[in-house]
């Protein structure tokens, strides 16, 4: 069963050894995945001094709520970065024998969007990769029981990977920007499952 609990400065959702924590830093909500209490991945957030406002590396979230039902939990987030209004729905579901977190992002804008992505720093190296292509990445995880972590994008979104230092990998789910639309969409999913 997927559950939710209040933690210091936020909420944690998940089942068994797999959890996603949403934390408030006084400006925005960020989120991170953990397995058996060890950090697996954390969202990389936009920085006004560093990032081009037309190229969203991650949606900005300033409000958080949640709801439970139907065997799952949803985290509902909204926020704004410059002219971009972001919303994200994170749906947590138990999938015997694993957990799935499906993410549906919508960004409405009065400005130009050249790129839309959700970016994460994964605490795994390329040598931990089990499988990879333009739609997904799978890593082997060590633990009490061998398991895997999967990150996938739903078409037309795609996945990209880059080195994130000596002990990490930077990954993105990249949405297709529709220039004639004021609303852009991005769909991706995290999955944890035992081997």
Predicted regions and their residues:
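Solvent-exposed loop and beta-edge segments used for protein-protein assembly and interaction
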Residues: 5-7, 12-14, 25, 67-71, ...
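A short, sequence-level motif marking secondary-structure junctions
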Residues: 24-29, 44-51, 92-96, 154-157
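Extended, loop-rich substrate-binding clefts of extracytoplasmic carbohydrate-active enzymes
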Residues: 47-108
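Beta-strand-rich recognition/accessory modules
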Residues: 45, 80-82, 109-114, 149-195
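Acidic (Asp/Glu-rich), glycine- and aromatic
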Residues: 99-133
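Broad, structure-driven detector of short, well-ordered beta-strand segments within folded domains
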Residues: 2-5, 14-25, 86-94, 143-153
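Beta-strand-rich N-terminal accessory domains
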Residues: 1-48, 192
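Long, charge-dense
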Residues: 127-150, 169-174
């Amino acid at each position: 069963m997927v559950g939710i609990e209040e933690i210091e400065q936020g909420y944690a959702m998940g089942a068994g050894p797999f959890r996603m924590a949403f934390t408030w830093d006084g400006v925005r909500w960020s989120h991170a995945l953990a397995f058996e209490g060890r950090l697996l991945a954390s969202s990389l957030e936009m920085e006004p001094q560093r990032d081009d406002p037309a190229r969203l590396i991650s949606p900005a979230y300033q409000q958080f709520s949640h709801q439970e039902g139907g065997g799952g939990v949803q985290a509902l987030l909204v926020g704004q970065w410059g002219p971009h209004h972001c919303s994200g729905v994170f749906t947590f579901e138990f999938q015997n024998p694993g957990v799935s977190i499906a993410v549906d992002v919508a960004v409405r804008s009065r400005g130009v969007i050249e790129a839309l992505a959700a970016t994460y720093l994964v605490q795994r190296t390329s040598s931990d990769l089990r499988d990879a292509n333009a739609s997904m990445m799978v890593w082997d995880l060590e633990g009490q029981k061998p398991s895997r972590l999967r990150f996938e994008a739903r078409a037309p979104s795609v996945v990209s990977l880059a080195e994130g230092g000596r002990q990490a990998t930077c990954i993105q789910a990249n949405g297709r920007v529709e220039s004639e639309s004021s609303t852009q969409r991005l769909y991706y999913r995290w999955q944890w499952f035992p081997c």
